[in-house]
């Protein structure tokens, strides 16, 4: 259905509505996904300055890209970073250096750029069955779900309060403030922490409020290339971009698939130099942005979100310092709750399909976290899943 163009009479209310949608989407992007970066980084031994530079890169550069693309196409094309990819990197950092990871980011960006420019994205995804990709994603994500469960032992009251709030908001389904359930859980968690002891951030000079991004010299190694490049590219194309594209198409937009892939690769080359992981089109954030009934104005909320992202990225040291000071159980709960639906979708996609055995093998091999030939398990999950599916499920293939 065609919408009437914005008029003076309704422009203020439309702009306000799009602004609020953008703010809600930003709260989501700046909470649990950032907590996942912090959790992965701390578990891998990265420094606070490394984490701050990572957050700067994925918010600031992608914020500018989101504004440019949304204005150009008059669609809500918001780009951030691949969350499954961040978890893959956390696993990889157990065996390779961060500089080698940076090298893999650059190669992934080049691969995505090539796939977008040649239009091979659809062919690649047709060759690699989605259930196998989802099996690999489930194997990577499941540890975050388990960490949330284990957090009950570490801090039962905090984790219970956050989890019950999350479930209660979902059950009521009609809260006066149209915020995602995760934001209510975040607010409850922050209140409890401040009531107890506050966030003990120590000395934090004003000069550290604005980020001083680090630049990295990439190192290229065969092990990092094999372990990360293909899995990262697959998560960008299949686990992230595909989700965002479906969200946009469902409300009548026509996102440029090959152009999106090309710009994901192009921007990944820049974010990598500052420690940022590969760029992707977002799914959940774009889903929030398109929740209004004015498709012709959705791009406005994407522009607002891009501005929020840039400002947030510039204050990355403050964000990093506060989140690192938070109790581990808080971060584990935030990340676990945020990934519940994604984990459910990954399991459903892996096993409720025509390639369940391939999905199962991909899941088990990835979950096992056993590196072979000095290459991490997510890569082997895809390899063995594809082989088993080809041998046992050829009749199910299209």
What annotation goes with each model-predicted range?
Residues 1-21, 197-216, 390-398:
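Intrinsically disordered, low-complexity non-transmembrane regions of multi-pass membrane transporters
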Residues 2-15, 39-65, 230-299:
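Membrane-embedded helical hairpins/re-entrant loop segments and their flanking transmembrane helices
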Residues 20-32, 180-181, 195-196, 213-243:
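Hydrophobic, membrane-embedded alpha-helices of multi-pass small-molecule transporters
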Residues 25-27, 65-77, 173, 267-277, ...:
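Transmembrane alpha-helix interface/packing and boundary motifs in multi-pass membrane proteins
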Residues 32-36, 78-86, 241-242, 276-286, ...:
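Transmembrane helix boundary and interhelical junction motifs in multipass membrane proteins
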Residues 51, 57-58, 65-121:
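Membrane helical hairpin/interfacial module
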Residues 88-94, 166-170, 285-301, 305-307, ...:
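Interfacial segments of multi-pass membrane proteins
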Residues 95-200, 305-398:
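Membrane-embedded alpha-helical modules
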């Amino acid at each position: 259905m065609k919408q009437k163009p914005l008029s003076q009479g309704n422009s203020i209310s439309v702009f306000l509505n799009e602004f609020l949608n953008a703010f809600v989407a930003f709260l989501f992007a700046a909470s649990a996904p950032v907590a996942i970066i912090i959790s992965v980084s701390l578990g891998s031994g990265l420094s606070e300055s490394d984490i701050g530079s990572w957050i700067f890169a994925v918010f600031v550069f992608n914020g500018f890209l989101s504004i440019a693309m949304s204005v150009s196409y008059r669609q809500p094309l918001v780009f951030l970073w691949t969350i499954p990819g961040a978890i893959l990197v956390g696993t990889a950092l157990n065996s390779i250096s961060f500089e080698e990871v940076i090298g893999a980011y650059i190669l992934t960006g080049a691969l995505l750029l090539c796939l977008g420019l040649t239009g091979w994205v659809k062919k690649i995804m047709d060759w690699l069955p989605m259930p196998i990709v989802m099996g690999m994603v489930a194997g990577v994500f499941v540890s975050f779900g388990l960490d949330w469960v284990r957090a009950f032992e570490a801090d039962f009251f905090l984790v219970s309060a956050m989890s019950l709030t999350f479930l209660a908001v979902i059950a009521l389904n009609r809260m006066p403030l149209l915020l995602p359930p995760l934001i209510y859980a975040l607010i409850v968690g922050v209140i409890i922490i401040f009531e107890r002891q506050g966030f003990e951030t120590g000395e934090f000079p004003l000069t550290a409020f604005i980020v001083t991004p680090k630049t990295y010299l990439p190192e290229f190694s065969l092990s990092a290339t094999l372990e990360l490049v293909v899995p990262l590219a697959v998560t960008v194309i299949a686990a992230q971009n595909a989700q965002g594209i479906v969200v946009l198409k469902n409300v009548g937009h026509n996102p440029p698939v090959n152009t999106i892939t090309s710009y994901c690769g192009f921007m990944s080359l820049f974010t990598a130099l500052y420690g940022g992981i590969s760029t992707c089109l977002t799914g959940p954030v774009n889903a929030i942005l398109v929740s209004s009934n004015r498709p012709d104005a959705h791009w406005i909320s994407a522009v607002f979100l891009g501005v929020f992202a840039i400002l947030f990225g510039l204050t990355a040291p403050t964000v990093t310092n506060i989140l690192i000071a938070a109790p581990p159980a808080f971060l584990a709960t935030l990340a676990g709750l945020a990934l519940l639906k994604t984990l459910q979708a990954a399991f459903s996609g892996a096993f409720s399909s025509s390639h369940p055995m391939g999905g199962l093998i991909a899941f088990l091999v990835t979950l096992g976290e056993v590196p072979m030939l000095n290459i991490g398990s997510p890569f082997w999950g895809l390899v063995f899943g594809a082989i088993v599916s080809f041998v046992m499920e050829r009749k199910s293939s299209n």
